[in-house]
A protein has these predicted regions:
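Short Fe-S-cluster ligation motifs
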Residues: 4-20, 29, 43, 47, ...
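Feature captures the FAD/FMN-dependent oxidoreductase FAD-binding
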Residues: 140, 145-149, 197-246, 354-367, ...
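Conserved hydrophobic helix-helix packing surfaces used for dimerization/oligomerization
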Residues: 146-148, 169, 284, 437
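FAD-site-proximal beta/loop scaffold in flavoenzymes
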Residues: 250-281, 374-447
């Protein structure tokens, strides 16, 4: 441990963001660079706890106190070695992870937690700058061929791990560029796409084969893949959006959030000349209070929307934890994103009733009613508040209320993978009902976080490697703690 009283001596600091009035004019990342001296101070705040709950909070099991100590001592090779032992892509999670590790930080009981996400990002970027992250192809090949379908974070992680195990990996992507949700779902002001391109170029050097513009069932059939490859990983995400199912949701101008966000990312990436869904000069309603809804706010502000309102069915969370939500649980508190800072009205405890439209079939308004949440029989339910129903202007609406499961496009069935009633595939140890076909990420577990997708890709790779070779030398999440501890101790 570098500084025994660092958590007392230094306060939590995070990067300064660019002025909202300036940054809404571009799609660049919003945060300014963070100085090396300040980063060392933030790493020094880690208490090197006897029981580091941050491990448990991180789906990847990142060995956080150890890499914090390495950063404090400016041992960048050690820091990236520790971080990469559990996380294939710290440059992604260091930018877009909601940091459940920080919510579990012991310091967070009565102080601000350690800025773990910031430290993680800076380890990755420093390692790239110093040439510490470079192509590392496997020394031997097994002669086995693996197909990975879907190039989101789960597919990329599975491909990376399986390639390191010595298998010949081909990653199939239906879109023009690699990245899946990272590429087409997350705005550039949160994750600029050169970050993905840099990693993909590295994986290509290491031997991973990328086949873009390749949609299973069109460009190539599932049967052909099953015949050509020794095993398959399906990792195409949970892309089926949850519908609002209210009257008038067929009007022009009512869209699922990913239609809007995906097209905008295609514009920035040079795949489209302009976004066919424009928020310029429009009264925008965002239905759903999560991160995807927040991304719609930020993008609409950059389009020049006349007004933006975000609606949330649930009640407004408290600013601080309350007694029924103690540490180390995920804090159910009010969160203000960078997009909220740029401008939007937020309304909580509100129910959408009906879209209204004109004779041309265009949406013009949305009827709302306030609701009151009450506990009945140990369960929370809501009631409409009489006299609060009203219709507000709405020229453009984005539905961002989550996803129900994998896209219903017949992909699972084509590969012989049976599904459950909730549309998720049946699986045991990441293996589908077709022994040759494995599952990873949101496609297997349902909608989740990028960090969970990477974890899923890693765990799936171990089970697939065992299927092909009988045993696997790839690290499992739990085993990696002991491996890294031994390396550090040695």
């Amino acid at each position: 441990m570098g500084a025994k009283e660092g958590f007392i001596q230094f306060k939590r600091e995070t990067p300064v963001s660019r002025d909202p009035r300036e940054r809404v004019n571009d799609y660049r990342e919003i945060y300014e660079p963070f100085s090396g001296e300040k980063l060392n101070e933030q790493a020094a705040r880690c208490m090197d706890c006897g029981v580091p709950f941050c491990h448990n909070g991180c789906p990847l099991g990142n060995v956080i106190p150890e890499f914090n100590d390495a950063v404090y001592n400016q041992e960048w090779g050690e820091a990236i070695s520790i971080l990469r032992s559990t996380n294939n892509f710290p440059e992604f999670t260091g930018r877009i992870c909601p940091a459940p590790c920080e919510a579990s930080c012991v310091l967070g009981i009565n102080k601000d937690p350690v800025a773990i996400e910031l430290i993680e990002k800076n380890i990755a970027e420093k390692a790239y700058d110093l040439g510490l992250i470079k192509a590392n192809p496997p020394e031997k090949r097994t002669g086995k061929k693996v197909a990975v379908i879907g190039s989101g974070p789960a597919g990329l992680a599975a491909a990376d791990q399986l390639n390191q195990a010595g298998h010949e990996v081909t990653l199939f992507e239906k879109d023009a560029k690699v990245g899946g949700l990272l590429r087409y779902g997350i705005p550039d002001f949160k994750l600029e796409k050169w970050v993905i391109d840099r990693r993909v170029a590295l994986m290509q050097e290491e031997g991973v084969i990328f086949s873009t513009n390749t949609e299973i069932g069109h460009s190539i059939q599932a049967d052909e893949i099953l015949k050509t490859f020794d095993a398959v990983v399906l990792s195409t995400g949970a892309a089926h959006p949850r519908a609002l199912n209210i009257k008038g949701d067929h009007y022009k101008g009512v869209h699922f959030a990913m239609e809007f966000l995906g097209k905008q990312n295609q514009v920035i990436g040079g795949e489209l000349a302009e976004n066919p869904i424009s928020a310029e000069g429009k009264h925008v309603i965002v239905i759903g209070g999560g991160d995807t809804g927040s991304d719609c706010i930020g993008t609409s502000n950059r389009h020049g929307a006349a007004s933006i309102t975000q609606l949330e069915l649930l009640p407004k969370p408290p600013k601080q934890r309350n007694f029924i939500n103690p540490w180390p649980e995920w804090p159910m508190t009010l969160k203000t994103s960078s997009s909220h800072e740029e401008g939007a009205e937020r309304i909580f405890s509100i129910l959408t009733k009906e879209f209204t439209g004109n004779e041309m079939g265009e949406v013009t308004g949305l009827t709302l009613v306030d609701i009151e949440w009450k506990e009945k029989g140990g369960r929370m339910s809501f009631e409409e508040i009489p006299g609060t129903e009203r219709t507000v202007p709405c020229d453009l609406a984005f539905i961002a209320i989550g996803y129900t499961g994998p896209a219903q496009n017949g992909l699972l069935q084509a590969f012989g993978a049976e599904t459950m009633e909730n549309s998720l595939p049946k699986s045991k140890n990441y293996q589908s009902t077709n022994p040759k076909v494995f599952l990873a990420g949101d496609m297997r577990r349902g909608q989740s976080l990028v960090v969970w997708a990477i974890s899923e890709g890693r765990e799936t790779a171990v089970k697939l490697d065992e299927y092909l070779m009988g045993t696997s030398s790839l690290p499992m999440k739990d085993e990696s703690f002991y491996q890294v501890d031994e390396q550090v101790a040695g």
